[in-house]
Amino acid sequence: MPTIFQTPTPNIDITLNNSTQFYYSTPQQTSPLQKQQQQQQQQQQQQQQQQQQQTSPIQQQISQQQQISPLQQLLQKQQQQQQSPVHQIHQQLIQQIIPPKQQEKQQEKIQDELKIQSTTPVINNNINNINNNINTTNNNNKTNERQNNEESNQISTITTTGTTTGTTATIISPNKLDIEQFVKGNEKVSRRTRAHVSLQNLDFEELDAYFDTHVSTIPLEEATSLSQSNHFGFLDTNIYNDEYKQFITNLKSGGFGDINIFEEEDDEDYIPPEEEEDDDEDNINVYNDKNIDYSTNITSKNNSNEDYNSNEDHNSNDENDYNNTANNINNNNIGDESDNNNNNNNNINNNSNKGDDDDDDDDDNNDDDDDDNDISYVDLNNDGENDESSNEMAALVNDYLENEAKEINGQNGFFKLLDLNLGEQFKQVIAPLPLNQITSTIQQQQQNDFILPIENFIGISNSVLVSPIPDFDPNFKPDSKIEKKLSSITLNGTQLNNLYITTPPQQQQQSSSSINSSNTMSSSSSSSSLSKNKLKKKKKEEKRKEEKRKEEKRKEKKRKKRQSITISKFKKNKKKTNGGFSSDSESDSSSDDSDDSDFYYSDIEEGGGGNGNGSGSGVGVVDSDNEEGDSSSDDFSKKKKRKLYHTNNSNNSIENNNNNNNNNNHESTSNSIFTLTLEQIQEVKLQIAQHYQLLIQVYLLMRIQTNPENFNLNLKKKKKIQSSSSSSSSTIKEIDSAEDDEDNYNNNNNNINNDDEDDNNNNNEDDNDDIEKYYSTYRNIVNRKPPTDMVQHNGMIDSVKRMLDQLFNYHQKHVENQIYSKIIFQQMESPSKVFTRSVKKALVPHVTSQLFDSEAIKLYPYLNELIVEDPIPSFKTMEIILSIFKDHFSESYNYRNVKLNQLKFTGGEDLLLLMGVKRFGTFNWRIIQKRYFPNKTDDQLFHRYKNLLSHSSANNQLKQYLNGAKFTKEEEEKLDGAIKIHGLKWDIISRDYLHWKEPAMLKKFYEKREKQVEKKNLFERRQLKKEKRNLERQRKQEQQRLLELEMEQDEIERQKQLEFNSTNNNNNNNNNNNNNNNNNNNNNNNNNNNNNNNNNNNNNNNENSSTNSNNDSGNENNYEFGDNETEILNDNIEISTTIDINNPIIENNSSTSTTRETSPVQMNPCPISSLSITNQQFQLQQDQYQLQQYQFYQQQQQYNQQQYEQQQQQQQQQQQQQQQQQQQQQQQQQQQQQHEQQQNEQQRTNNLSTETIIKSDNLNIVDGILIKWTREEDRIILITVKEKGTVDNEIWKSLSDTKIQDKTPDQIMYRYLQLLELIKRSQFAKQ
């Protein structure tokens, strides 16, 4: 049989979500079964050709006239389609989806295919020829009739219209694959299983198309009516429900891999147990929508055996009516093939039931064989090769629904957990809640708004699982911008629904919307009706939203009024000495507010801190639904420690955040995600477990206080007294009426009754003893008096119950998300292998949660059952209930271990306190108590905070955080600005400017900074003083050195003078002696001459004597002077000595020789008469000497001055030389720097060349150092330069100080230049 070459054209479907879906079919290889069938078909074709040769020439002419060229048929189809309004919508959608280039390519392909099809024979003509030949066959030939019946079932085409587009698709009954015959032929006695059918050459896209055709889409309007909701408001997923079967068949396969996580042992060899088949179970009914026109009721069996070829006496008219109905449907949809096909089909069916009785028996057998496989499907490719594979998959799906799905239903109803609940417009996928979930009225309203359509389960495959958001990182430092976002995130708030599954990105949404589907398509009128209905729904939803907003605004106004009232009352009561809120109106309002809002969703101004010793209850639990009046009495006693006005500002800021969150409930939020370490996750798990344990104990103890029998001990004592009096009266009656038998009988009865009363009294005594024991054990927690306001007490119980319900629900969601991640998001081989034996083990895995203590939380439903069975609570029942959780609860947190009327803070609670201080500061204790400590009061938190910060406490994390947290520059600037405005008022500064810093911490930082400044100033002053002292010392040392030099010079001069004087004295003495000798000689000579002249007659002896005497006189002055002469001589001698002593010596530094300038008195030799020198002459000589001496003194002073001037000149010259040397050194340094800069520039140029060799743009070499840059740093550099518009050294310094502290300014500058070069290169490359 010739095949038709056809291009993969997109089939478009507009689903109820207004999302287009298209896919392409791929060619498929042939299996050995298909080859056998092809051989059979070829044999049939040969027989048909032989029959055609036997036909009459008249029929051949008629058939040739009826034949039309394929081009004409295609043109007729296109004209009809273009005239239809649906085709226009189809073209618009294609233009929106397919780009123009692809459209042109598709048109070219279609034109090429038309040319190919013009050469090929037409299928319709072949069909007509075959049908005409069948009319002439012998009615008695059984084999030919059997073949004709098969061909009639194979070739009959039924056309249907699309749901929303104008494109048409043909539903062809494929070649049936009789799997039972195939199994029997291989001699294997078994049911249909995947192991005995070859799945290699199957087309999975056709399988998906088969699922889509047999499973109808449920519109949104009727989803609520069709869903079978349980008492919790969720869909019931029974395994035998049709909707659930549709849900299973809608699980898509795509490009997924193995889901076999745990074991893959017996996947191929598994054979399900045999069971009796019911005809009703094989039927796959198709849902007929109001707006969708289906062709006929397509079922797994067309009719029962009674109506289909079972008896001989079927009338041809009935069969013709049946066939005419199908043909009429065909005539409505396709006009060009209606005439030929109707006649031929009628001829085939008229001849199909003619035969003998043996033929009927054979037909019955064939019907039995074909019952399980006669399932129609949509053939998108119109290829005969894929017919067999589709029947194989249909058989496998039926086998799964009959066998394997029943076994899965017995596994604790796991599929009851697979209910899904999508958000608004299916943008956000939200995990479902379990069936055993305890829900409030608010939660039920939210969950019933949106119910999952069956097809839209596909959207989950594109969602992204995200780890839960942690509360805070321990190194987290909040900013003013982040606080608003963080205040909206709560540990127990509504936004935890978004922690587990987030919305997929746009690309994934588009991919999910473009999944292959081939559902039946409706007419254009149905699409318009759907659009109108959607518009009406949108309008209704908008009206509802507006009404909700109005109601929220009204509630806000009421809250503000209440707040103003409470503030006014607070001011009034503050003036009183015995302060305290004791008004009844506030307690009434608190009870009203508790009904409107949940425990954790209530506003902060309505919440309050109840005390364990207060009037509300005897348990240390706080109900946040109550107003501030419950704990305000404690605030007045402790107002010295904590100021109350700090709480007002915090409440206002958090009100705004809550209002914003209420307005944006339905919007998709993008919460910031923080990564968690394993240690942090374990800490969170411990905190949740402790919180859960404390809540259960609080809940049970508060229930005990609702039973008045646990408190009325006095009534039981009165009953004891009455019973004792009755017993005494009965003994008296016995004594008085002992004679009468009747009286004795009555007395015996009375005694029996009295004995019963005594037993009861003994039991009451035992009960009282037990109650007293319980009160002794729980004396620090439970008061003996019942609560005064039972309404308020019941409200607190409800709030604690809500918290437990929320915790359980979050745990269930967390577990379900882990299950979905293993089932849905893992790869699957094919839809037939979705639930194999190994997968069934993975469907209900033992989930180990990292965030929850699952073993303890799973017991919560049993707690609810026990509470229902215990309407009259007591201490015994409480201990019985707590014994269930004994293995999972820690003894350190049991109430029996509590002492001194308060619970000790655990390590986990200390961590929660640290998280609260980081997030809300040290003034918002009430907010911290609401968010983190429902079982504590704000006063307890404040005292714990102070105890942890005290000097006596050990080192802890809170102390490390507050003492070790460094101030940033921004915080310092804020603090300086606040000090200028408010001074040293640390409370105001920490409240208004730096609320995450404690006042004591601010004070300590300020004092420490000022001390450091003072130390710096002192150090600078001391340095100045030291410098001054050093200068003075140096000056004094120089003066002393100069004085010492002068003294040394003076001493040297004195020594020289002494030596010179000593030499002068010796010379003078020698000269004087010589003069005297000369004088004596002269005198002797004169005397001798005179004597010779006078006495010529003297003897020679006298001469000798005279001569001897003269010679002797040279040594001895034997000359005798007179008185006057001696005096004059003595004076001369004294003068000479004085002159000699004072005779100066002038030394020149240039020469070592000494010059002596003396002016001694020269006494000319004269006779004795000349010795009589007058005093006047002597005085003149003395005056001359003095003048000479004065001149010498002046010369000496001039010499000293010259020497001093020379020293100064030398010093100046030395200073000038030093200055010159310094200048030379500076010049040398400058030259060196210039030389180094030149070298650096050369290195940079070389480095740039090396960088191009390295081909890495994020590396830079500066001063021989390789530096790595990130994109964020480059972005910061470019943005700052762009904002400031200039390039200065100040910019680089500011960047290195603030934003890029790891780099120097020079490195940043060179990186900027490098970036400019890279940008230029990229632009040049583009050009």
UniProtKB/Swiss-Prot annotation:
Residues 533-542, 555-577 have a biased composition (Basic residues). Residues 897-953 form the HTH myb-type domain. CDD domains: SANT_TRF. InterPro entries: Homeodomain-like_sf (IPR009057), Myb_dom (IPR017930), SANT/Myb (IPR001005), YY1-Transcr_Regul (IPR052435). Residues 959-1010, 1268-1316 form the Myb-like domain. Residues 607-619 have a biased composition (Gly residues). Residues 263-283, 356-374, 585-606, 624-633, 754-770 have a biased composition (Acidic residues). Residues 131-153, 263-390, 504-668, 717-770, 1061-1122, 1144-1168 are annotated as: Disordered. Gene3D superfamilies: Homeodomain-like. Its main location: nucleus. SUPFAM superfamilies: Homeodomain-like. SMART domains: SANT. GO terms for biological process: regulation of DNA-templated transcription. This is Myb-like protein O. The gene is mybO.
